[in-house]
Amino acid sequence: MDELAGEFAVGVIEGDIATDLDAAKLGGRGAQISLLNTGNGFGGECHLDAPMVNRALQGLDLARLDLVIIENVGNLVCPAEFDVGEHAKAMVYSVTEGDDKPLKYPVMFRAVDVVLLNKIDLVPYLEVDVDSYVARVREVNPTATILPVSARTGVGMADWFDWLRQFVVGSAT
């Protein structure tokens, strides 16, 4: 968020089953935040849908925003199956999850425009082959942009921010 705050007015719809912990982490970082809890007393929804997002959009001053990021409830199954009105879909896929996830959960991987292959800083300790992760993603989505990143160290994040910049500029035309 800090990287983009000076360039674009950003809004975030933060989807979680319960709590405002993630939204609180983003508070004060230059973005408008709209919290969307799906909890219903029985565990909550495992995804967001368009009506939920529409309600959350009411909490943002859209006329003043260049980009709205929707963080869906986090798993690799449900979110891919529900249209939330997005113009592009990104996902975070961590090297700690194993390279088999694109084959086990192909719907999500087929649906995305960009894959952030996160926790790349752990590769030396996990003894994993990044090329294998990329190849598995390519099996189910040959056109997705794949960006190896480390949110912790910042490695590769410039590429992600460049992707977002190109998206925002391209969407404005």
For each of these PLM feature ranges, what is it?
Residues 1-87, 98-100, 109:
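Nucleotide-state-sensitive switch-loop elements of NTP-binding domains
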Residues 13, 116, 147:
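Conserved Rossmann-like nucleotide-binding pocket used by diverse enzymes
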Residues 122-173:
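Canonical P-loop GTPase G-domain recognition
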Residues 16, 71, 118, 133, ...:
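Residue-level signature of catalytic and energy-coupling elements of molecular machines
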Residues 22, 104, 156:
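Short acidic active-site motifs
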Residues 35-37, 91, 148:
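Structural signal for conserved beta-strand scaffold positions within catalytic alpha/beta enzyme cores
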Residues 76-88, 92-144:
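Conserved C-terminal guanine-recognition region of P-loop GTPase G domains, centered on the G4
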